[in-house]
């Protein structure tokens, strides 16, 4: 075994909110352990704690025991470390001789991930890479190192479909132990052999942590079946208990009436004795009620919908791009871009990492911003491009003065599982999923009738994913998105296009 925990509990230092409760976990050699849970429930915190508690000591309180029996861990974080951004690719791969790296493997992984090996020694700044390419270079270098355990935080984020398939196969077939956080249901279904589920219930005052050595789909099915079985049992118990109590109330009422109407002392003593017996029986029933099957705690996910939007008339053209060029940092990405989208259409865009998908969404956003006939909603790849990180969720949505708007915003935030403390935290302190919820809520409040979304589902938990797909599937406006989420593309988008250097072309299937 590589990791064992006993009664591991984790709390936030700031507000003492529980994230992990009494986790007893064994991670053996070869296990593929997926950590899942709602946004802001502490998945990344648990991952770092299992790797090295010193990484979280500044903001978390940890109790219980953790034993580690690994010597060569690899860790790829959710976001590119700041110190890497201004390095060149040559710096990243070759500036220091690392004896743990198998360079033959490194070049093989670069080839398999369609990352031109000539670029490995180039002076291109890492900051100029696309989100998917930044993750690729970390995978290429890290996986070529000697290791006995791998920690990955949202490894499927930003990856194109080919790389995603490669990573799924790597995890599924690797003899190494891999512990990872993921939101991608297809990815989880193809890779996980053990599930650690972090839940937060009772308005985030109670943490529930469960572990199952089982694949993800079986876990979902088992959890859903157990949930509804417990509901049924709890309802049956209450129904039977109510029958017993109804009979008891009738008997108690009869004895009370008899007692009130008895004037004979001897008969009165007998009736009083009977009342004492009835009251004793009532106390027994109250104790029985405590042992009845409890209604299961349910962790709500996303409860949100677009209402009262004014759709653009169906005949109207939203996008009409004819033979334009797409540039990024003085680099020509696409030289002959044609794109037409009519009102009401839902279009998905896929393509290789670095081809320009996020640049295309930005281009369309700039193109549509000046249109007075549209109410535009936008979710960029990097939330900080739009979110004022120093503000709180409440002031971002409702400003600081309008009380009515603030009350409405508080109601919406509560429906998205923000606590009263979290609505006053700086946006920079929120998880990626919580920041995504804020952008989503902003679009709803703005009654946006055209949405431009860059990877809209990537930071939402597997529990929230079906709600997200339903939200956008029911949406009555126009939607254009970049996504590598296969379920999202299948269930939401009417058409899917692939972007390449030559332009966009329509796919029959994905």
Which functions belong to the PLM regions below?
Residues 32-38, 44-101, 199-204, 346, ...:
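ABC ATPase nucleotide-binding domain signature region
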Residues 71-134, 145, 238, 381-442, ...:
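ABC-family P-loop ATPase nucleotide-binding domains
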Residues 184-190, 485-491:
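Conserved H-loop
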Residues 5-8, 15-28, 64, 321-325, ...:
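Conserved beta-strand
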Residues 139, 440, 468:
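Hydrophobic anchor residue at the start of the ABC signature
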Residues 201-232, 499-510:
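Conserved beta-strand-loop-alpha-helix hinge in the C-terminal portion
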Residues 1-12, 101-125, 222-330:
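Coupling and communication elements adjacent to P-loop NTPase active sites across diverse families
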Residues 154-155, 160, 453-456, 460-463, ...:
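Walker B catalytic motif
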């Amino acid at each position: 075994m590589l990791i064992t925990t006993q009664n591991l509990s984790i709390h936030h230092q700031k507000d003492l909110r529980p994230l992990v409760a009494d986790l007893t976990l064994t991670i053996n050699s070869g296990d593929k352990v997926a950590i899942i849970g709602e946004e802001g429930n502490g998945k990344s915190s648990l991952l770092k704690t299992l790797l090295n508690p010193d990484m979280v000591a500044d903001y978390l309180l940890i109790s219980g025991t953790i034993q580690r029996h690994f010597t060569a861990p690899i860790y790829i974080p959710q976001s590119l470390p700041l110190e890497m951004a201004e390095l060149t690719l040559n710096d990243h791969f070759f500036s220091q001789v690392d004896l743990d790296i198998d360079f033959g493997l490194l070049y093989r992984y670069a080839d398999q991930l369609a990352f031109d090996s000539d670029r490995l020694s180039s002076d291109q700044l890492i900051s100029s890479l696309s989100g998917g390419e930044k993750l690729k270079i970390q995978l290429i270098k890290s996986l070529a190192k000697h290791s006995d355990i791998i920690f990955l935080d949202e490894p499927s984020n930003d990856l194109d479909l080919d790389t995603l398939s490669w990573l799924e196969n790597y995890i599924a077939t690797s003899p190494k132990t891999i512990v990872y956080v993921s939101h991608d249901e297809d990815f989880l279904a193809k890779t996980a052999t053990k599930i650690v589920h972090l839940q937060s219930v009772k308005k985030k005052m109670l943490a529930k942590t469960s572990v199952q050595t089982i694949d993800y789909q079986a876990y979902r099915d088992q959890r859903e079946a157990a949930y509804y079985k417990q509901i049924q049992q709890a309802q049956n118990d209450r129904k039977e208990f109510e029958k017993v109590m109804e009979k008891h109330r009738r008997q108690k009422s009869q004895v009370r009436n008899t007692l009130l109407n008895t004037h004979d002392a001897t008969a009165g003593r007998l009736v009083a004795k009977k009342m004492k017996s009835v009251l004793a029986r009532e106390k027994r029933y109250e104790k029985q009620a405590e042992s009845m099957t409890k209604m299961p705690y349910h962790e709500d996910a996303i409860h949100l919908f677009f209402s009262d939007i004014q759709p653009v008339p169906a005949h109207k053209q939203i996008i009409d791009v004819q033979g334009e060029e797409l540039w990024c940092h003085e680099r020509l990405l696409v030289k002959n871009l044609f794109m037409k989208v009519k009102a009401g259409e839902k279009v998905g865009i896929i393509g290789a990492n670095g081809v320009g998908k996020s640049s295309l969404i930005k281009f369309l956003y700039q193109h549509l911003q000046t249109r007075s006939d549209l109410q535009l909603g936008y979710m960029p790849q990097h939330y900080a491009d739009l979110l004022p990180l120093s503000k709180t969720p409440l002031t971002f949505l409702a400003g600081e003065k309008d009380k009515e708007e603030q009350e409405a915003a508080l109601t919406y935030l509560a429906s998205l599982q923000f606590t009263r403390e979290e609505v006053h935290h700086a946006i920079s302190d929120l998880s990626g999923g919580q920041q995504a919820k804020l952008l989503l809520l902003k679009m709803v409040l703005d009654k946006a009738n055209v949405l431009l979304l860059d990877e809209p589902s990537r930071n939402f938990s597997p529990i929230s994913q079906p709600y997200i797909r339903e939200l956008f599937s029911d949406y009555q406006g126009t939607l254009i998105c970049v996504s590598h989420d296969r379920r999202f593309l299948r269930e939401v988008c009417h058409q899917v296009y692939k972007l390449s250097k030559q332009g966009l072309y329509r796919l029959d299937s994905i």
